[in-house]
Swiss-Prot record:
Taxonomic placement: Eukaryota, Metazoa, Chordata, Craniata, Vertebrata
Similarity comment: Belongs to the prickle / espinas / testin family.
Subcellular location: Cytoplasm; Cell junction, Focal adhesion
Primary location recorded for the protein, binned into one broad class: cytoplasm
Organism: Nomascus leucogenys
UniProt comment concerning the protein's domains: The N-terminal and the C-terminal halves of the protein can associate with each other, thereby hindering interactions with ZYX.
Coiled-coil region: none
The protein's name: Testin
Length: 421
C-alpha cells in the first residue's frame, strides 16, 4: 500500500465508545463523543480512558500491532479474517474452595492479564506482590487501572499513522521509521523468574585478580565466589532493597540479566506507574513506558497528544504544538497572534475566557477582563478601580487602604461594619 492510500485511510475512530458514560464526571457528561482531532470527549474534555468504554478487542489489536515484526511474535496471533495481529493476552483464572456450613463452594477469581509463565504458582505470587488496587482482577479497581494505563502508556497514535490527524506522506514515512527503530532498539517485555533459577541459567561474569578462569586457582576462586553469592541477597535495581528468598523478580532482557526488580518496582522512570503488562522501553539505563520513551525522543503536541514529525511547530507555555493545533481549548479557534489565557494548562482565547472562566467582580457584578488589574481576597475579586473596590457601607475607595472583609463585602472601619450588621 502506498503512502497516499495510507493517508486516505486515516481516521480517529469516532464511533468507538460513542455515548459511554464518564467515570470521572458521572452525570455531568452527556456521554463520550470523540473530538475531531483532540483525543478527548467533546462533552466533558476527559480522555477516552476515563469513560466506560469496552475496548478489550481494540486494545488487543493495538498491542498486537506493537509486537508485530519483533521477537515477541509468540505473544500475538493473526486473525484469519483480516490478518490483523491480536495480542494473546494471558488470562489467569484461580479457583479457591470456600468452606460453608453445609457444603463447600468455589470462589473464582479472574485476572484480565497475568505473566505468561508456565508455573501458575509463580504468576500467583507475582500478583500478590502488586498493590491490591493494581491487581487486574476482572470488574475491580485494578482492572480499571490496567485499562487506563494501556491507553495512557501505549497510545495507538504513537505507533499507527492511521490513528493520527492529517499526517503528510513525509510524516507517515518518518513515523514508520521511528516505530521500526524503537521496536528494534528499545521495546521489551519483562520476564518473571526466581533469581536462584536465573543464576543457574546465566553464569555471573567474575573478575578474579591474578588468575585465569581455566586454572585450578581460578576454579577454586569461582567456587568460593559462587558459595558466597548464594549467601548474599539480591537487590532491586529500582528501590535497592533486598529481594526475599523465594519471591519472584522481573528481568528485562535489554537491561541485562544482572538487573532485577520487585514486581511493584517495575515502573516507568518518568510517571512511576506500573509498566502495563510488563511492556517496557529501555534507554540510558532506565525503564520507560511507551509514552514517556517517545517523549524522550520526539516533541509531543499538547493539543492532539500526537508526536510531532513536522519540521515546523510552535512552542508556548513550555509545551510543543503543531501549528494548526495551537487553538483555544474551548472553541478551537487558532491562537497564533491572538491574546489567550492559560486555564488549567490549556490555552483559552479571550472571548471564551470572559464567557466561561473569568471571575465576577463583587462590586459591579461583571466579568473581570484578563488584562485588567483586580483585587482578590480569598474567593472574592473586584476590579481594581475607584468604581468597584469600595466600602460596602460608605462607598469609600479602598485601593491602597486597610479593609475588613465580611462574606463578600468589604468595610473601611468597624463603624461601617456595625452599621451594616
Amino acid at each position: 500500500m502506498d503512502l497516499e492510500n495510507k493517508v486516505k485511510k486515516m481516521g480517529l475512530g469516532h464511533e468507538q465508545g460513542f455515548g459511554a458514560p464518564c467515570l470521572k464526571c458521572k452525570e455531568k457528561c452527556e456521554g463520550f463523543e470523540l473530538h475531531f482531532w483532540r483525543k478527548i470527549c467533546r462533552n466533558c474534555k476527559c480522555g477516552q480512558e476515563e469513560h466506560d468504554v469496552l475496548l478489550s478487542n481494540e486494545e488487543d489489536r493495538k498491542v498486537g500491532k506493537l509486537f508485530e515484526d519483533t521477537k515477541y511474535t509468540t505473544l500475538i496471533a493473526k486473525l484469519k479474517s483480516d490478518g490483523i495481529p491480536m495480542y494473546k493476552r494471558n488470562v489467569m483464572i484461580l479457583t479457591n474452595p470456600v468452606a460453608a456450613k453445609k457444603n463447600v463452594s468455589i470462589n473464582t477469581v479472574t485476572y484480565e492479564w497475568a505473566p505468561p509463565v508456565q508455573n501458575q504458582a509463580l504468576a500467583r505470587q507475582y500478583m500478590q506482590m502488586l498493590p491490591k488496587e493494581k491487581q487486574p482482577v476482572a470488574g475491580s479497581e485494578g482492572a480499571q487501572y490496567r485499562k487506563k494505563q494501556l491507553a495512557k502508556q501505549l497510545p495507538a497514535h504513537d505507533q499507527d499513522p492511521s490513528k493520527c490527524h492529517e499526517l503528510s506522506p513525509r510524516e507517515v514515512n518518518e513515523m514508520e521509521q521511528f516505530v521500526k527503530k524503537y521496536k528494534s532498539e528499545a521495546l521489551g517485555v519483562g520476564d518473571v523468574k526466581l533469581p536462584c533459577e536465573m543464576d543457574a541459567q546465566v553464569p555471573k561474569q567474575m573478575n578474579i585478580p591474578g588468575g585465569d578462569r581455566s586454572t585450578p586457582a581460578a576454579v577454586g576462586a569461582m567456587e568460593d565466589k559462587s558459595a558466597e553469592h548464594k549467601r548474599t541477597q539480591y537487590s532491586c535495581y529500582c528501590c535497592k532493597l533486598s529481594m526475599k528468598e523465594g519471591d519472584p523478580a522481573i528481568y528485562a532482557e535489554r537491561a541485562g540479566y544482572d538487573k532485577l526488580w520487585h514486581p511493584a518496582c517495575f515502573v516507568c522512570s518518568t510517571c512511576h506507574e506500573l509498566l502495563v503488562d510488563m511492556i517496557y522501553f529501555w534507554k540510558n539505563e532506565k525503564l520507560y513506558c511507551g509514552r514517556h520513551y517517545c517523549d524522550s525522543e520526539k516533541p509531543r503536541c499538547a493539543g492532539c497528544d500526537e508526536l510531532i514529525f513536522s519540521n515546523e511547530y510552535t512552542q508556548a507555555e513550555n509545551q510543543n504544538w503543531h501549528l494548526k493545533h495551537f487553538c483555544c481549548f474551548d472553541c478551537d479557534s487558532i491562537l497564533a497572534g491572538e491574546i489567550y489565557v492559560m486555564v488549567n494548562d490549556k490555552p483559552v482565547c479571550k472571548p471564551c475566557y470572559v464567557k466561561n472562566h473569568a471571575v465576577v467582580c463583587q462590586g459591579c457584578h461583571n466579568a473581570i477582563d484578563p488584562e485588567v488589574q483586580r483585587v482578590t481576597y480569598n474567593n472574592f475579586s473586584w476590579h481594581a478601580s475607584t468604581e468597584c473596590f469600595l466600602c460596602s457601607c460608605c462607598s469609600k475607595c479602598l485601593i491602597g487602604q486597610k479593609f475588613m472583609p465580611v462574606e463578600g463585602m468589604v468595610f473601611c472601619s468597624v463603624e461601617c461594619k456595625k452599621r451594616m450588621s
